[in-house]
Amino acid sequence: MYKLFTLLCFVFLFTKSAKSQTSDSTKVNSLEQQFSDSITQINEQNEHLKASRDAYNEGLFLLKNKNYNEAIPCFTKAIGIDSIFFQAYLSRAKCYEKSDDNLAIADYLKTFELDSTNLLPLYEVASLYLKTDKSLAKEMYTTILSLKGDEYLAISQLGVIAFMAEKYEVAEQLFTQSLVININAYTLNDRGSCYRKLDKLDLAISDYLAAIALNSNLAFIYSNLASVYAKQGETDKALIYYDLAISKDANYALAYNNKASVLLGENKFEKAKIEIDKALEADAEYAPAYNNKGVINHKMKKYKEAIAAFDKAIQIDVDYAKAYLNRGISKQMIRDEDGACFDWEKAKELGILMAKKYLANDCE
């Protein structure tokens, strides 16, 4: 009986052991399968990520070479594989800027949604809004400041919007607020331009000189400073700073044209003409240079040549009020009274008060 019990126990234990081994083997096989599946999944994910990055890098190469339309499908492919690839959205937005602002804005906003630590996409959106809707741009810069109150660039851009709206005192305050956070040549220049508009010329000069001290390579600051000296009647200083502006940018049409205006004011017509020719060489579609060319020819009693120059200025800018006024004066000199009155009427419509005087004296 004892032997039989022992045998039964052995058989039971063996059976239990066998079942345990079978169970352990099943568990091991299951774990091995899970591990294998995990490795396969990781490999597939890596392949997808590699495909996404390869498409992105191809897009970057095309973007760098300004092949914007060709780059867009590459970034779209990268995003299709990896929907949270915010760098691809950002790069595609840069491409869309060349053809569709709305698509660019959508991608910039998506970029910020995926990476809210980077405010650059919001600045880009504000910049696009600035071209068509300044109120939306203002809202976006205000949003940036609500996220990070010391964003001096956003404050400066609000100043630019105020300046464009001819709210010079508001703009000056915003530029000053920005400069408290960060002193830089661009904002000093912008505040100087506010002072110039407000006829605080000494303060304007101070800001322009401070801006030049910080960055001596920005041609437009020299030109702005020259314009203040010209306004003060310090023509020698004005000419010096226009020359400095031109030395920084040999294709600076505005500086050539403004230098010509100073020379024209001194009745140095031949020298002024040389500067106008340089302005038009730098930019053949620069309407103010054609207007000045017309004034020079008028002063030299070349009235038909003057009219031709004014014609060109108006062809480039159909709302160029001063060109209409000046062309009317030249037309009067060749006895084209109807043409003169037409031009003065147009100048009046565009806001030139002096045109009313000519209309009253010669057209009524």
Language-model segments: residues:
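Conserved alpha-helical positions within TPR/SEL1-like repeat arrays
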Residues: 56, 60, 87-94, 120-127, ...
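Residue-level recognition of tetratricopeptide repeat
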Residues: 51, 85, 118, 151, ...
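Structural motif corresponding to the intra-repeat A-B loop/turn of tetratricopeptide repeats
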Residues: 65, 98-99, 131-132, 165, ...
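Terminal, low-structured helical/coil segments at or just beyond the last alpha-helical repeat
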Residues: 24-48, 329-364
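Canonical positions in the second alpha-helix
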Residues: 78, 110-111, 143-144, 177-178, ...
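Structural marker of alpha-solenoid helical repeat scaffolds
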Residues: 81, 114, 147, 180-181, ...
